[in-house]
């Protein structure tokens, strides 16, 4: 029996113990399983309280059962849901009973969603939106994921693909009537106009500069500077907990420490790097090398120094802010020199000036992400396939190109959009996409 023909089950809720747990069953034998456990099939889509019993008749739990007959279910198959008390023993007894049914097996990660995809309940971009929703850490990420799950990109791609196929039909009709010049011209003219319009529309989406991808991946802020200037104290204050060791001895931090922040709904990763200095210690040298590498790759660098040190930052990056720390210990201010980067005076230990720095970080994040929720593209896969589709459309518009070549380019463009939606040639990416889902989803 092919794995997709088997009935699957899994715990669909979080770690046990918990108030309740939900076990989901999907496949052709779901109704048989539900009847065996409860004695009868409940009315479709109605929660019914029932006794759940093993095949020997022993009581497993007093629970609730729901029945979703095909095709009106999340997977497009017969689906049963069993709501039980969230006890490890109860869940184990139910799973043991389910495992005893012939043709019924535990689900693989993401298999419920994959079956929904294969049965036309959602396209591949919507499945990716569901994955993003599951992994969303901030409110902005949640809203973007819901838009993708709702079909904001999939609906647009379907419309583009349908219009390309319409244009292709006109081109192929023009080829059929190539002996009748006037008829062929009348068909090719509207086709080229439609192609040009679609090409411009897809190009506009590609020009979004990765807003959706930025929101999905987050912004990276690196804290860099000489040893013993308070970098670990600052990251602890940003995290509102102790994540880095604070020591008066220089060189305490030798590896990169990361924390995740939610700045007004925007996802930000802050990294605490090793102090930058010359050292004979091979371990510290490696820490310094990593620190410079991570700072150079960051979207923003906070160059931390003491309040009396006005030297220029010793790192490169797209945006560098100078942060003068330990102002609570300083006896006076020093004049700033060098490039006109923002300068903040704080005490990471007492919190003085920290609110101003945090406010500017939040403002910078808002500018960095822009109106990210308006972006359609949230993954590199989307961008590559849309770029392929757009390139084929552009080539089809080359003046003097033979109609047969135009038709071939349009087929290639439609094929790229089909891959985007998961309609054609996507077996190589399905395992990667659905493998990210948890078991039971």
Swiss-Prot record:
GO CC annotations, alphabetized: cytoplasm
Cofactor: K(+)
Keyword flag Metal-binding: yes
Pfam families: MMR_HSR1, MnmE_helical, TrmE_N
Subunit structure: Homodimer. Heterotetramer of two MnmE and two MnmG subunits.
Isomerase keyword on record: no
Organism: Rhodopseudomonas palustris (strain ATCC BAA-98 / CGA009)
InterPro entries the UniProt entry points to: AAA+_ATPase, G_TrmE, GTP-bd, GTP-bd_TrmE_N, GTPase_MnmE, MnmE_dom2, MnmE_helical, P-loop_NTPase
Keyword vocabulary terms for this entry: Cytoplasm, GTP-binding, Hydrolase, Magnesium, Metal-binding, Nucleotide-binding, Potassium, tRNA processing
Biological function: Exhibits a very high intrinsic GTPase hydrolysis rate. Involved in the addition of a carboxymethylaminomethyl (cmnm) group at the wobble position (U34) of certain tRNAs, forming tRNA-cmnm(5)s(2)U34.
EC number assigned by the record: 3.6.-.-
Places the protein is found: Cytoplasm
CDD domains referenced in this protein's UniProt entry, alphabetically: trmE, TrmE_N
One MF term in the entry's GO annotations: GTP binding
Swiss-Prot/TrEMBL GO biological process terms: tRNA methylation; tRNA wobble uridine modification
Cofactor note: Binds 1 potassium ion per subunit.
Binding-site residues, Mg(2+): 232, 253
Binding-site list for GTP: 228-233, 247-253, 272-275
Main subcellular location of this protein, as a coarse class: cytoplasm
Domain TrmE-type G: 218-366
Name of the protein in question: tRNA modification GTPase MnmE
Gene: mnmE
Family per similarity comment: Belongs to the TRAFAC class TrmE-Era-EngA-EngB-Septin-like GTPase superfamily. TrmE GTPase family.
Residues involved in (6S)-5-formyl-5,6,7,8-tetrahydrofolate binding: 24, 81, 121, 441
Coiled-coil stretches: none
């Amino acid at each position: 029996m092919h794995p997709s023909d088997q009935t699957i089950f899994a715990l669909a809720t979080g770690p046990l113990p918990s108030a309740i747990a939900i076990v989901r069953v999907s496949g052709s034998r779901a109704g048989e399983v539900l009847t065996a456990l409860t004695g009868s099939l409940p009315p479709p889509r109605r929660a019914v309280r029932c006794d759940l019993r093993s095949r020997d008749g022993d009581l497993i739990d007093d629970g609730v059962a729901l029945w979703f007959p095909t095709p009106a279910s999340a997977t497009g198959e017969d689906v049963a849901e069993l709501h039980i008390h969230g006890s490890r023993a109860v869940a184990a007894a139910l799973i043991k009973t389910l495992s005893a049914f012939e043709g019924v097996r535990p689900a693989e990660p993401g298999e419920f969603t994959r079956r929904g995809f294969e049965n036309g309940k959602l396209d591949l971009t919507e499945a990716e939106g569901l994955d993003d929703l599951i992994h969303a850490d901030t409110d902005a990420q949640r809203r973007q994921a819901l838009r993708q799950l709702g079909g904001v990109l999939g609906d647009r791609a379907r419309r583009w693909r349908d219009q390309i196929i319409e244009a292709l039909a006109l081109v192929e009709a023009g080829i059929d009537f190539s002996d009748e010049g006037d008829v062929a011209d009348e068909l090719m003219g509207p086709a080229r106009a439609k192609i040009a319009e679609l090409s411009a529309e897809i190009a506009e989406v590609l020009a979004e500069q990765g807003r959706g991808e930025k929101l999905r991946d987050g912004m990276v802020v690196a804290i860099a500077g000489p040893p013993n200037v308070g970098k670990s104290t600052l990251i602890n204050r940003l995290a509102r907990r102790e994540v880095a060791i604070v020591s008066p001895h220089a060189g305490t931090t030798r590896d990169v420490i990361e924390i995740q922040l939610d700045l007004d709904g925007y996802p930000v990763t802050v990294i605490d790097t090793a102090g930058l200095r010359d050292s004979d210690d091979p371990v510290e040298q490696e820490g310094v090398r990593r620190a410079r590498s991570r700072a150079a790759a960051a979207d923003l660098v906070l160059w931390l120094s003491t309040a009396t040190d006005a030297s220029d930052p010793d790192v490169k990056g797209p945006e560098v802010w100078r942060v003068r720390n330990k102002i609570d210990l300083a006896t006076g201010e020093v004049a700033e020199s060098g490039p006109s980067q923002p300068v903040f005076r704080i005490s990471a230990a007492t919190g003085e000036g920290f609110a101003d720095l945090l406010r500017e970080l939040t403002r910078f994040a808002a500018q960095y992400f822009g109106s990210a929720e308006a972006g359609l593209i949230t993954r590199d896969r989307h961008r590559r396939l849309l770029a392929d589709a757009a390139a084929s459309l552009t080539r089809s518009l080359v003046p003097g190109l033979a109609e047969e070549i135009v038709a071939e380019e349009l087929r290639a463009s439609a094929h790229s959009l089909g891959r985007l939606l998961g309609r054609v040639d996507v077996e190589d990416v399905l395992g990667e996409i659905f493998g990210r889902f948890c078991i039971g989803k």
